[in-house]
UniProtKB/Swiss-Prot annotation:
Activation and inhibition: Phosphorylation at Ser-510 by PRK2 may release ROPGEF12 auto-inhibition, thereby activating ROPGEF12 and downstream Rop signaling.
Superkingdom of origin organism: Eukaryota
Residues annotated with Phosphoserine modification: S510
The species this protein was found in: Arabidopsis thaliana
InterPro entries xref list: PRONE_dom, RopGEF
Protein name: Rop guanine nucleotide exchange factor 12
Keyword Cytoplasm: yes
Gene, per the UniProt record: ROPGEF12
A Gene Ontology term for the protein's cellular component: plasma membrane
Biological process, per Gene Ontology: embryo development ending in seed dormancy; pollen tube growth; regulation of pollen tube growth
Role, per record: Guanine-nucleotide exchange factor (GEF) that acts as an activator of Rop (Rho of plants) GTPases by promoting the exchange of GDP for GTP. May be recruited by PRK2 at the plasma membrane to maintain polar Rop activity in the pollen tube and control polarized pollen tube growth.
C-alpha cells in the first residue's frame, strides 16, 4: 500500500515537472508537446488509465491533423518515390557507363586495340540512337513520352563530349596591383559553340511539330492488314500505313495547318542540310579516296557525260534531263562521278606535280577546268536539293569513316539524323496532302493545269534561262518584219547569240568561291 502511494506521488511529480518544462521552453514547442504527449500516455498506461485519446501528429502546414495511419502512408509514399528515383539514377549510371565504355573501346569489346577511332565511334553511337528512337516514326503523331525522354537523355550524354572540346583564346586578367595582363584561357571550340545550340533548336522544333498533331482527328491511318484497305496500295511504300481522309477531303483549316507545318519542317531540313554540307566540306579528303580516283575527269564521268558538261552553252537542267535517274542507285552513281571529277579538277588546278606534264593534261587550260568544276558543283547542288533523302556518296562515307576530329563527327552525325528526321516528317505530311488531293475532285481542269505548270517549272525557268521563250519570241517577231534582207541579217546576228551559263549566273558564286 505504501509502495503504491509512493509510486503515485512520483508519477504526479513527473507529470508536474513536464508541464512546467513545456511552459518555460517556448522555442521548441512542437518537440516538447510530442514528448509530453508520449510521457503522459505512458504514465496513464502505468496507472491503469485507458481513457486517454489516441496519439496525433500535427502537420507543419495548416490543415487538419493527420492520424497515425495517414501520416505513415505519406511517409511511405515519399520514401517509395525517393527509392524509385535512386533506382532510376543507378540504372542511368549503369547505362551511361556502358555507353561510354563502348566509346572508349572503339566498339571492340575484346579490348585488343582493333577498334575504330573515337570520332567514328561517337558518330556511330549517335546514328544508332536515332535509328532506334525514330525508326518507328511512320505516322504524324506525337512521340511516346518514354521514347522522347530516352532520346533527350541519351543525346545529351553524347553531346556532353563537345563541352570539353576547347580552344585557346586570349583574355585579360587584372592583377592585385591593378595592372592588366594578357593570358590564354580555354573556351568551347567556335564551330561547336555556334552549331550545337542551333542543332538542339532544330531538334526541339521537329519534336514540337510532331506534338502539334496530338489533337487532330480529321485523318487517320489504316494498317496493311485492315479490311478497309483498298487494292490501290503503293508497293514502293508498303511498310508505311495508308492515310485515310474524310470523303469530302480535309477542311480548309486542316490544309492550312498542314501547309504551315510543312513549311516549318522544310526550313528545319534546309538548315540541317546546310550545317551538314558545311561540316562535310571542312573534313579532310582521305588519301585512300584520292588514290582510288581515275587520272582525269573524262575517265570519271565517261565520254558522253563529259561532253555534256564541257559544251559551250551549258544548261544544268537540260544535263540532268538527259541522265537516267530512274532509281536511287543511279542517282548515287551520278553523284559519285560528279564528286570525283570535282576533286580531280581541283587537284589539277592547285597541285603542280609531275603528273601535270602528262600528254592528256595539256589539252585543257586552267580557265576551262575551273569552268567545268563550277558546272559540276552546280549539278551536285541541284541533286542534293532535289533528292535530300538520297544515300550518301562515296566521298561522304570516306570522309566520315576516316575522320579523326571528334567535334566534326558530332556535328556531322547530329545534323545528318536531323536532316533524315525532317525528311521523314516532310514525307508523312506529303502523304496526307496527297491522300486529300486523291480523295476529292474539287480541282477544276484549269486549276489542275495551273498546278501542272507550276510543278513542271524547270531550273532554267527559275534562273531566267528562257531559251525556248526567246526562240518563240524571235519567230513571232520575224513574222511582222519587212522583207528587207539587211534587217533580217542584223536580227539573226543579235538573236542567235545565247548567253553562256556563267554570264547568266551573274553574282551567284560557286561553292569554292565562298570558302
Amino acid at each position: 500500500m505504501v509502495r503504491a502511494s509512493e509510486q503515485e506521488q512520483e508519477t504526479y511529480r513527473s507529470r508536474l515537472f513536464n508541464f512546467k518544462w513545456r511552459n518555460n521552453d517556448n522555442n521548441s514547442a512542437t518537440r516538447h508537446n510530442k514528448s509530453l504527449s508520449v510521457e503522459t500516455g505512458l504514465d496513464e498506461a502505468a496507472t491503469g488509465s485507458h481513457d486517454a485519446e489516441p496519439l496525433t501528429i500535427i502537420h507543419p502546414s495548416q490543415g487538419p491533423p493527420l492520424s497515425r495511419s495517414a501520416a505513415d502512408e505519406a511517409v511511405l509514399a515519399a520514401l517509395a518515390a525517393s527509392q524509385a528515383r535512386e533506382r532510376q539514377l543507378l540504372a542511368d549510371m549503369e547505362q551511361m557507363k556502358e555507353r561510354f565504355s563502348k566509346l572508349l573501346l572503339g566498339e571492340d569489346n575484346s579490348g585488343g586495340g582493333k577498334g575504330v577511332s573515337s570520332a567514328l565511334a561517337l558518330s556511330n553511337a549517335i546514328t544508332n540512337l536515332a535509328a532506334s528512337v525514330f525508326g518507328e516514326q511512320r505516322r504524324l503523331e506525337p512521340m511516346p513520352a518514354e521514347r522522347r525522354a530516352r532520346w533527350r537523355k541519351e543525346i545529351d550524354w553524347l553531346l556532353s563530349v563537345t563541352d570539353y572540346v576547347v580552344e585557346f583564346a586570349p583574355s585579360q586578367q587584372k592583377n592585385k596591383d591593378g595592372t592588366n595582363m594578357e593570358i590564354m584561357t580555354t573556351r568551347q571550340r567556335t564551330d561547336l559553340h555556334m552549331n550545337i545550340p542551333a542543332l538542339k533548336k532544330l531538334d526541339a522544333m521537329l519534336i514540337d511539330c510532331l506534338e502539334n498533331f496530338k489533337d487532330q482527328s480529321e485523318f487517320s491511318y489504316i494498317s496493311k492488314d485492315s479490311p478497309d484497305l483498298d487494292g490501290k496500295r503503293n508497293d514502293e511504300k508498303w511498310w508505311i500505313p495508308t492515310v485515310k481522309v474524310p470523303p469530302d477531303g480535309l477542311s480548309e483549316a486542316s490544309r492550312r495547318f498542314l501547309q504551315y507545318q510543312k513549311d516549318c519542317v522544310n526550313q528545319v531540313l534546309k538548315a540541317a542540310m546546310a550545317i551538314n554540307a558545311q561540316v562535310l566540306f571542312e573534313m579532310e579528303i582521305p588519301e585512300s579516296y584520292i588514290d582510288s580516283l581515275p587520272k582525269n575527269g573524262r575517265a570519271s564521268l565517261g565520254d558522253q557525260m563529259y561532253k555534256n558538261i564541257t559544251v559551250d552553252f551549258f544548261d544544268p537542267d537540260q544535263f540532268l534531263s538527259s541522265m537516267d535517274m530512274s532509281s536511287e542507285h543511279k542517282i548515287v552513281d551520278l553523284k559519285n562521278r560528279i564528286e570525283a571529277s570535282i576533286i580531280i579538277w581541283k587537284r589539277k588546278m592547285v597541285y603542280k606535280d609531275n603528273k601535270s606534264s602528262a600528254p592528256w593534261a595539256s589539252g585543257v587550260s586552267l580557265e576551262k577546268r575551273e569552268v567545268f568544276e563550277e558546272r559540276a558543283e552546280t549539278i551536285l547542288l541541284i541533286l542534293k536539293q532535289r533528292y535530300p533523302g538520297i544515300s550518301q556518296s562515296s566521298l561522304d562515307i570516306s570522309k566520315i569513316q576516316f575522320n579523326e576530329d571528334v567535334g566534326q563527327a558530332v556535328l556531322e552525325s547530329y545534323s545528318r539524323i536531323l536532316e533524315s528526321l525532317a525528311y521523314t516528317v516532310l514525307s508523312r505530311i506529303d502523304d496526307v496532302l496527297e491522300a486529300d488531293r486523291a480523295g476529292n475532285k474539287r480541282n477544276t481542269p484549269l486549276e489542275a493545269e495551273e498546278e501542272t505548270l507550276v510543278g513542271s517549272m524547270t531550273l532554267s525557268d527559275f534562273m531566267g534561262w528562257d531559251f525556248d521563250q526567246a526562240a518563240n519570241a524571235e519567230l513571232e517577231s520575224k513574222k511582222d518584219l519587212p522583207d528587207d534582207p539587211l534587217i533580217k541579217e542584223k536580227l539573226s546576228v543579235v538573236t542567235t547569240k545565247k548567253t553562256s551559263y556563267l554570264e547568266t549566273l551573274g553574282g551567284v558564286k560557286s561553292p569554292t568561291a565562298r570558302h
